[in-house]
Design a protein with these regions (language model features):
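Transmembrane beta-strand segments that form the barrel wall of outer-membrane beta-barrel proteins
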Residues: 32-40, 61-73, 90-104, 127-138, ...
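Short loop/turn motifs that connect adjacent beta-strands in outer-membrane beta-barrel proteins
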Residues: 23-29, 89, 160-168, 196-209
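Residues that define the transmembrane beta-barrel architecture of outer-membrane proteins
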Residues: 28, 48-52, 59, 75-79, ...
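Outer-membrane beta-barrel initiation region
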Residues: 24-59
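Cleavable N-terminal export/targeting peptides
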Residues: 1-29
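Hydrophobic/aromatic-rich structural module bridging two neighboring secondary-structure elements via a short loop
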Residues: 75-116
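Outer-membrane beta-barrel "beta-signal"
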Residues: 158, 193, 199, 219-230
Length: 230
């Protein structure tokens, strides 16, 4: 939910091909990659079918800037820009979600659009990670009375290894009534289980393959998606 993408990708590419060091001596790290998924699943909803989801990012000394996109078979596509800072297990960040569809304008943050800015706070304890997200600008959602809801979502996730496969289990909920997540009050809207395994393609090359089973207890929906990462 892209204008700055060309400039951003150029910066990332330049960083990959020429060693850059920040003034404090810490190298700037860059990464670029993509996922290909059978369904685009997000927070208890299926947003799209098969999709190509590229990402590019820079990180220096805990400060990161990244762009992520999703483009499927429909006319709509999504671009998310994230600025975040992490230290220890603590992370704070802001994400701009931009849904590009017919008639949409990037600088339009009115409540009637799908354009939205979200702030997040999180802490990774190792065995368990906690994250809180709140819509703060644009499509913030409405309460049943018509007031701004500042729709929020919090999630508890836990990684583990079983049978030689990396797993992650997560449960997410929205804490109060809002039409953004379609909740009339506190509601658990996402319960997911994701498995990831490296598949060897030769002696020195492998790709991660992952599968996600996601349920939405509130809407009584169940989704399944598989994907590969490059």
């Amino acid at each position: 939910m892209k204008k700055r993408m060309v400039i951003f990708a150029a910066i990332a590419a330049a960083t990959v091909f020429s060693p850059i060091s920040a003034h404090a001596g810490e190298p700037i790290k860059a990464e670029i990659g993509t996922d290909i998924v059978s369904s685009y699943l997000w927070r208890g909803s299926r947003l799209d079918g098969p999709a190509f989801q590229p990402t590019v990012g820079l990180e220096w000394n805990g400060l990161s800037l990244s762009a992520w996109g999703s483009s499927g078979l429909s006319d709509a596509c999504e671009v998310d820009l994230t600025l975040a800072y992490s230290i220890g297990g603590f992370t704070v960040g802001v994400t701009d979600y931009w849904a590009a569809y017919t008639g949409a304008k990037f600088f339009d943050f009115s409540a009637e659009t799908l354009h939205m800015a979200e702030v997040n706070l999180g802490y990774d304890f190792g065995p368990v990670a906690l994250n809180w997200y709140t819509n703060c600008l644009g499509a913030v959602g409405c309460t049943p009375e018509g007031a701004k809801a500042y729709a929020s979502y919090f999630e508890v996730s836990a990684p583990f290894c079983l049978g030689g496969i990396d797993w992650s289990a997560a449960v997410g909920a929205t804490p109060w009534a809002n039409d953004y997540y379609g909740a009339e009050g506190f509601a658990v809207i996402c319960a997911s289980l994701t498995a990831t395994k490296e598949i060897a393609l030769g002696s020195d090359f492998s790709i991660p393959v992952f599968a996600s089973l996601m349920a939405n207890p509130r809407s009584e929906q169940l989704f399944f998606s598989v994907g590969v990462s490059f």
